[in-house]
Amino acid sequence: MTYTINADQVHQIVHNLHHDPFEVLGCHPLGDHGKVNQWVIRAYLPTAEAVTVLLPTDRREVIMTTVHHPNFFECVLELEEPKNYQLRITENGHERVIYDPYGFKTPKLTDFDLHVFGEGNHHRIYEKLGAHLMTVDGVKGVYFAVWAPNARNVSILGDFNNWDGRLHQMRKRNNMVWELFIPELGVGTSYKYEIKNWEGHIYEKTDPYGFYQEVRPKTASIVADLDGYQWHDEDWLEARRTSDPLSKPVSVYELHLGSWLHTAYDEPVKTLHGEGVPVEVSEWNTGARFLTYYELVDKLIPYVKELGYTHIELLPIAEHPFDGSWGYQVTGYYAPTSRFGSPEDFMYFVDQCHLNGIGVIIDWVPGHFPKDGHGLAFFDGTHLYEHGDPRKGEHKEWGTLIFNYGRNEVRNFLVANALFWFDKYHIDGMRVDAVASMLYLDYCREEGEWVANEYGGRENLEAADFLRQVNSVVYSYFPGILSIAEESTSWPMVSWPTYVGGLGFNLKWNMGWMHDMLDYFSMDPWFRQFHQNSITFSMWYNHSENYMLALSHDEVVHGKSNMLGKMPGDEWQKYANVRALFTYMFTHPGKKTMFMSMEFGQWSEWNVWGDLEWHLLNFPPHQQLKQFFTELNHLYKNEPALYSNDFDESGFQWIDCSDNRHSVVSFIRRAKNSAEFVVTICNFTPQPHSHYRVGVPVPGFYTELFNSDARQYGGSNMGNLGGKWTEEWSFHEQPYSLDLCLPPLSVLVLKLSQNAEENTVPAEEASNIA
């Protein structure tokens, strides 16, 4: 018998050794014979007993014969090029009909795509790599593409082939990317990549560009369509595009979706497309399940809106296998976690946030990734995404791996990922986690455990260039968004534009302010007189960066206690201290972030496997604290002086910061391009002060806009009967002054009234002890 193929080629297919199975499998011309073309069709079907080719154009059936191997089939045909032919397969006495995936040779990836990706500049590579719905020659299916340049062979696994890697072997393009179109697959298909290295070892990997994954502990990717959701937030996006977020109020409620609120496991699960499957919180909390993105719309959004926050910040919602990582050990960078529902459910959640005037910020983790076998680690049998040198590629303290920022394709993966969340999910900002760990080669390393850069320094120049690139790219596509750095060192110009040498973020967490505040407020008030610099030092460097003041999740874990537990004194003083701290925070220059549970005074630390102690809201002190935060947020949003001029020296002026004996500070906040200003006076001791004089620049009646000691917040209700007139008494180098009553452990906010009608406030709202 004459064969059209040699045994060696069959051997390579049978043993998953061929880099391009299209050279062997599928339909191939054999040559012309007059007006009739001769073609050969080949197929490798490891479990087939018999195979027949079905030709739709002339309704013929041709039986295939085996060649060199009992499961390698071929047949020779004389006709015009066969298209859309099918294979009828007999196995175990059953028949099934499929389209031959090797009969579809139209690639989605162009040579230009691969070239730009190789340069690290394909900003929307997520539209090419991964799994994408396609129609080829009138047949619907899914196109798969994965970057695995050092693999010997790559196959696609799934329920559709009984997870048999011999059936859907991919072809390699330009020594970089493997691709294959599989007809008749669709949304909801579970799949993985089977990657064989040159030593013959096999790895099963989740799709790095996959849009959806199975619920942990399962790890397969799931085909998803991200283009089917109908958005309703056009007005929000247009307003964002044309505005400057740094001149707007930014008050962020940071939360972890998996521990904000749970419900009973047997409660029906609501999703965008009907009833869903419950996801148990943990083996230690078997009676509870997570709320879905869809259910959170009715629970979380009204709550945040009532409290007055402008944004929510979600601890990482990209897919991660371990709940205890809080989301910071990501395996699915392009997949919102399936714990809470589908990609469309998350789109609906963001859409509804926007329709209710709430922006959405996500925590983004480009600094490291876990070693889980199904993830990015050792992806193609080599150190592909991570540095091969553990001195540059491993965080030993965290047990994670570090991205190779100097490799174009890795950098492209991350830059495109940041863009992806803004593009496909309409998010409004990203908070980049652990920036310091990226910027320093000796981060958490002893001498001899790190490698210097090309200039002999400890700065990771590749990481710095990457951060500049990602910020430049994201801003170029989506002006008006927030890019926030959690950077805990003195690296210069973090929030400066890239064109002047900065890293390009528009905000940086002020970690120094956070540490100073918590140290100061945790000490006995009597000792605060010796530490006045703790509350004033931040203004010495405030204008070196665009700062965000954050009291985050990191401050209520690992034995640090929650905010009330940090405060000294009896219960009344603890609440008063918390109110004073947050009022000072909201009147200090800088945007604001605070973690869930602080708004009602949870006593316990945050527990990722539980939910918040909502029962505390049955008790007046916690109700009053929640009301305090609601009114503080509304004060902040309603007074341009408190937000519009945060980052210019004209926006802040000390009145007096030297009265350490009384632990009192006072200052002016001025609005941008306006004569508006507010005066803030802070008394950080339990000792009230009557007839305390404070200088002011303009005469008139100063309304007491806010008093953290008001009765409705649980305070002693000392104050100034709604406001005070100035006296022509120069004080604090100001031409006029106010004779004030300063309540204990309190902060007052005063504003010059513009007319007599504003000089009084309702009695029930006024602090009534002068």
From Swiss-Prot:
Keywords, ordered alphabetically:
Carbohydrate metabolism, Glycogen biosynthesis, Glycogen metabolism, Glycosyltransferase, Transferase
Q: Which cysteines are joined by disulfide bonds?
A: none
A Gene Ontology biological process in which this protein takes part is: glycogen biosynthetic process
SMART domains in alphabetical order? Aamy
Please give the pathway this protein is involved in: Glycan biosynthesis; glycogen biosynthesis
Q: Which Pfam families match?
A: Alpha-amylase, Alpha-amylase_C, CBM_48, GlgB_N
Supply the SUPFAM superfamilies for this chain: (Trans)glycosidases (SSF51445), E set domains (SSF81296), Glycosyl hydrolase domain (SSF51011)
Catalysed reaction, written as an equation = Transfers a segment of a (1->4)-alpha-D-glucan chain to a primary hydroxy group in a similar glucan chain
Q: Which InterPro entries match?
A: A-amylase/branching_C, Branching_enzy, GlgB, GlgB_N, GlgB_N_E_set_prok, Glyco_hydro_13_cat_dom, Glyco_hydro_13_N, Glyco_hydro_b
The UniProt entry's sequence similarity note says: Belongs to the glycosyl hydrolase 13 family. GlgB subfamily.
Protein name as it appears in the record: 1,4-alpha-glucan branching enzyme GlgB
Organism (species): Synechocystis sp. (strain ATCC 27184 / PCC 6803 / Kazusa)
Tell me the organism's taxonomic lineage: Bacteria, Bacillati, Cyanobacteriota, Cyanophyceae, Synechococcales
